[in-house]
């Protein structure tokens, strides 16, 4: 999760997030190059004497037309690749349904006969020592690591948004509509997110906690939860 005074992204825990971080660095390099060029030209114009001679500058016009087009292509190609990757859902090992409510989340594991629960934020007064304020929940979403997970997202009342930054996931939850996304958790851990669509007075109290575990631990957890 994010640390205090952190300026960069959270550590990537999925292939999609790794691609997003690389694209951010790529776009930042392009932006810095453009800013450096503009600042150099401004400094050059300020220090050099200007000539009032009007000349035909077809070469300059050609350069400032073609160069921005090349820059846009360099930004568009990796962006389109990531967009297609985010929309691709290829034979998921597990399907999870997330339903947004005011102000909690409900989860259903559709591959299991009877595995569903509600996930509420733990109030600050009940929070154990060492846990994170406004981010901990009473029931975490547990998924097997290194497995394709499909998440079907909807809402039961107003607009919500299911977002876990370290997994590179953010999908709107819309009443009467099913949206879907997917991710692969590449390492074990606990990943925190929050509702990312203003949904009412307690919008800030809708945390999301995804716990990635090895497959044997997930199977044990699902068996115990189904039995209870």
Curated annotation (Swiss-Prot):
Mitochondrial matrix compartment spans: 46-58
Protein topology in the membrane: Multi-pass membrane protein
Transmembrane parts of this sequence: 15-45, 59-86
Top enzyme class: translocase
An annotated GO BP: ATP synthesis coupled electron transport
GO molecular function: copper ion binding; cytochrome-c oxidase activity
This protein's name: Cytochrome c oxidase subunit 2
Organism in which the protein naturally occurs: Cairina moschata
């Amino acid at each position: 999760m994010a640390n205090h005074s952190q300026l960069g992204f959270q550590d990537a825990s999925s292939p999609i997030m790794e691609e997003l971080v690389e694209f951010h660095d790529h776009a930042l390099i392009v932006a810095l190059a453009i800013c450096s060029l503009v600042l150099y030209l401004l400094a050059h114009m300020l220090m050099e004497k200007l000539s009032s001679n009007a000349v035909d500058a077809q070469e300059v016009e050609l350069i400032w037309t073609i160069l921005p087009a090349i820059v846009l292509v360099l930004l568009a190609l990796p962006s389109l690749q990531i967009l297609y990757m985010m929309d691709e859902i290829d034979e998921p090992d597990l399907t999870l349904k997330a339903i947004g409510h005011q102000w909690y989340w409900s989860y259903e594991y559709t591959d299991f006969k009877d595995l569903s629960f509600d996930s509420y934020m733990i109030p600050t007064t009940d929070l154990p020592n060492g846990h994170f304020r406004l981010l901990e929940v009473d029931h975490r979403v547990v998924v097997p690591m290194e497995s394709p997970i499909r998440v079907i997202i909807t809402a039961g009342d107003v607009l919500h948004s299911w977002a876990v930054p370290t997994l590179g996931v953010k999908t709107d939850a819309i009443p009467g509509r099913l949206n879907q996304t997917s991710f692969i958790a590449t390492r074990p851990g606990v990943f925190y997110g929050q509702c990312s669509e203003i949904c009412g007075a307690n919008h800030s109290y809708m945390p999301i906690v995804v716990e990635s575990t090895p497959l044997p631990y997930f199977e044990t957890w699902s068996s115990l939860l189904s039995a209870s």
